Amino acid sequence: EHPVYWQKVQEETKGSGDFERSTCLFIDSEKAREHSEEEIIKIENIKGKLFLVGAEDDSFWETAKYIHRMDQRLKERPHTCEYEALVYEHGTHFVLPESLLRKALPVGLKFVLRFVFKAAKDYPGECEATRKDIDRKLSAALKEWREDFVNDHPSL
């Protein structure tokens, strides 16, 4: 374990209201040097349908910034994938479908989220609305994918 890593996380976390914060690590890594093209994930080479999902208030890393960056990269380069970039103002790091989180934690979900993330405490309704919107959009996409698959493979 790198001691400076955890020291920086502790410094950023202190007084933040979050159980843990680590955005400073990503901000510092980008300030330290330019990242070469070889280091960047070639998102345009991904086949299929992509959902790029994140929230502005993610306390672990700058999700929204990276989603905007991926969106821009896809706009500038040829690709065959369908994609949807979903950036929400509130949702915390756990921008997961509400139904998935409820299955993982059927009791105490709101308590846990509010304990871990200050944004979930400050904006509980908005965070829940984000999770429910993600749930609707991903469920609809999976239903469409399943229907397309069944129509394309009638013998299965």
Regions found by a protein language model. Name each.
Residues 46, 51-58:
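Short beta-strand/loop motif that positions the catalytic acidic residue
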Residues 63-67:
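Conserved strand-to-helix beginnings and helix N-cap segments that scaffold or border functional pockets
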Residues 39-45, 147-152:
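Surface-exposed acidic, glycine-flexible loop patches that form ligand/cofactor-binding
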Residues 36, 56-59, 122-129:
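Active-site rim elements
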Residues 56-61, 92-95:
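Acidic catalytic loop of the alpha/beta-hydrolase fold
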Residues 68, 76-156:
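C-terminal catalytic histidine-bearing segment of alpha/beta-hydrolase fold enzymes
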Residues 26-29, 53, 88-89:
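Alpha/beta-hydrolase-fold catalytic nucleophile elbow
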Residues 1-41:
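Mobile cap/lid helix-loop segments that gate and shape the active-site cleft of serine hydrolases
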